[in-house]
């Protein structure tokens, strides 16, 4: 199957609800590295700019309804015209027409040809919403985010900050990994990566963090399969570091799957590591990941919002990486941008409060509760911590300066840290560390 035909197939799957990373993993097996990179780049770029691309298509088709397969062909074609300088205009148009010719909608090849040629000739004449008159609509179209999210950020942070945040994106080809010190050392892993010819650069904040360039299917690497490295975002590593786990301590990871933070915490030699997960299939995946990485842990299927009586005051550290709206990941997960809805934020905040209330009871006097999310929503972050402290006077906020990488110390405030992708170059995470008073 040719590159663009495969891209069209995967785009259709994503539009039907599949996750892009999983679809790529499944469909790219057996392809050359060059083909993998092109297909992945075409799909990431198309989805990253889907709102703007659709605006362009609608501008040249008078907003008429277009069959979803034909629209996807047009999306891929317009993406190449707008963002792929190495693809000739003629190739972007002609290859798109060929895709329609091979489809059940082959009778529309003339329509696709005419639309793409018209767009190619008039790209510089497209009128976008006015930044001054319609700032939220401008941000939504130009950076391909839902209008409600553009309005939300505009109201919370102002235009310049909102634009910087929405316009930021990271190369899809950079895969963030960390050294698994349970099986190797930093020096040994570096030597193996260099020996295999991989290009990589060091992380921004964590010494054991690396970004491998231009790789699709990292789980196919022998270094991954042997458990020498783990795929994990750098912001997630910062959260695990902030837990300040000491040898021999009892540690609970309350919302643990797929196990990235649990595996990181295991490197600090806790006396007991318990990993809880709500869904059995995710718990099984977590067990597989932990086993591959050489981690010994108790894995339990349990709803973290419900209290386990036998675990009350049993842990020195309790980590809650709460289920959240994941708004801090949208810059690198373009396929989920348009699956988000404002109503879910308040629902998630209520779930998070239930988890906080239950898990706080597992913390020993003098122990710590670490709360994190991968979102930028006030309701799920600061407002939750304010609520929790008001209802749990036995907890107080810890000064994060002692637990953060030096470059982030100035960003912490009152025991909390909010990371932004465009400011910090990593996922948008929230972190709060709370300590329970000693008796």
Residue ranges and their predicted role:
Residues 1-439:
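S-adenosylmethionine
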């Amino acid at each position: 199957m040719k590159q663009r035909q495969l891209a069209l197939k995967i785009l259709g799957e994503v539009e039907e609800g599949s996750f892009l990373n999983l679809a790529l993993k499944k469909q790219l097996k057996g392809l050359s590295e060059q083909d993998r990179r092109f297909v992945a780049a075409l799909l990431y770029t198309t989805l990253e700019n889907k709102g703007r691309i659709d605006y362009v298509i609608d501008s040249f088709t008078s907003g008429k309804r277009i069959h979803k397969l034909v629209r996807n062909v047009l999306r891929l074609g317009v993406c190449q015209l707008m963002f792929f300088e190495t693809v000739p205009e003629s190739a972007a148009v002609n290859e798109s027409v060929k895709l329609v010719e091979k489809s059940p909608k082959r009778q529309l090849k003339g329509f696709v040809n005419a639309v793409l040629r018209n767009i190619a000739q008039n790209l510089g004449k497209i009128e976008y919403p006015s930044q001054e008159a319609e700032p939220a609509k401008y941000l939504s179209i130009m950076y391909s985010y839902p209008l409600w999210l553009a309005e939300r950020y505009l109201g919370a942070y102002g235009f310049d900050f909102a634009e910087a945040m929405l316009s930021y994106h990271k190369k899809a080809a950079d895969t963030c990994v960390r050294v698994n010190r349970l099986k190797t050392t930093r020096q040994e892993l570096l030597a193996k990566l260099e020996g295999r010819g991989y290009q990589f650069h060091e992380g921004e904040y964590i010494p054991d963090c690396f970004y491998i360039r231009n790789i699709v299917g990292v789980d196919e690497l022998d270094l991954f399969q042997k458990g020498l490295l783990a795929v994990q975002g750098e912001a997630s590593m910062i959260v695990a570091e902030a837990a300040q786990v000491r040898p021999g301590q009892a540690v609970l990871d309350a919302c643990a799957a797929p196990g990235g933070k649990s595996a990181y915490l295991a490197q600090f030699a806790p006396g007991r590591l318990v990993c809880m997960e709500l869904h059995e299939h995710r718990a099984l995946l977590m067990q597989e990941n932990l086993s591959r990485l050489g981690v010994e842990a108790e894995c339990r299927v349990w709803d973290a919002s419900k209290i386990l009586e036998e675990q009350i005051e049993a842990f020195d550290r309790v980590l809650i990486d709460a289920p959240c709206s994941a708004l801090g990941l949208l810059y690198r997960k373009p396929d989920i941008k348009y699956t988000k809805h404002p109503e879910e934020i308040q629902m998630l905040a209520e779930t998070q409060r239930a988890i906080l209330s239950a898990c706080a009871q597992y913390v020993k006097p003098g122990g710590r509760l670490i709360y994190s999310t991968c979102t930028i929503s006030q309701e799920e972050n600061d407002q939750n911590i304010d609520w929790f402290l008001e209802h749990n006077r036995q907890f107080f906020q810890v000064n994060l300066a002692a637990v953060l990488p030096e470059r982030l110390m100035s960003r912490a405030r009152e025991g909390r840290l909010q990371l932004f992708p465009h400011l910090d170059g990593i996922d948008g995470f929230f972190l709060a560390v709370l300590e329970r008073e000693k008796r």
